Amino acid sequence: MSVETFTPAPLHFTQGAASKVKTLVDEEGNPRLKLRVFVTGGGCSGFQYGFTFDEDVAEDDTIVEREGVSLVVDAMSFQYLVGSEVDYQEGLEGSRFVIKNPNATTTCGCGSSFSI
């Protein structure tokens, strides 16, 4: 009898998010840009997500690649994001990158604030 161990990806970068990052990077004309996801203190639930584009990668950053583009997370933020999904959604309320975080015990209606 064999036993298989399943190790989930530490961070899931969806096809939709990667496609949007690729479009935005192409529009900027700078292939060195990467989507940086970070967590800061604040928001109505204690922590909040942030997104920015960055050319630099620190030694302790985690990098997830998909479709030729990269998502980058700093070491401090990564501990709060393990197992999360980074996606891109378009709807009546507008378009935005979103994080589905299984570690969050409380989230705010805005979708960008959470607590653990």
Swiss-Prot record:
Reported cofactor(s): iron-sulfur cluster
PROSITE patterns linked to this entry: HESB
Family: Belongs to the HesB/IscA family.
Quaternary organization: Homodimer.
Cofactor note: Binds 1 iron-sulfur cluster per subunit.
Pfam families in alphabetical order: Fe-S_biosyn (PF01521)
Function in brief: Required for insertion of 4Fe-4S clusters for at least IspG.
Protein name stated in the entry: Iron-sulfur cluster insertion protein ErpA
GO molecular function term, any single one: 2 iron, 2 sulfur cluster binding
Amino acids binding iron-sulfur cluster: 44, 108, 110
NCBIfam families the record matches: iron-sulfur cluster assembly accessory protein, PRK13623.1
Keywords for the protein's UniProt record, in alphabetical order: Iron, Iron-sulfur, Metal-binding
InterPro entries: FeS_biogenesis, FeS_cluster_insertion, FeS_cluster_insertion_CS, FeS_cluster_insertion_RrpA, HesB-like_dom_sf
Chain coiled-coil ranges: none
Any one annotated GO CC term: cytosol
PANTHER family assigned: IRON-SULFUR CLUSTER ASSEMBLY 2 HOMOLOG, MITOCHONDRIAL
GO biological process: iron-sulfur cluster assembly
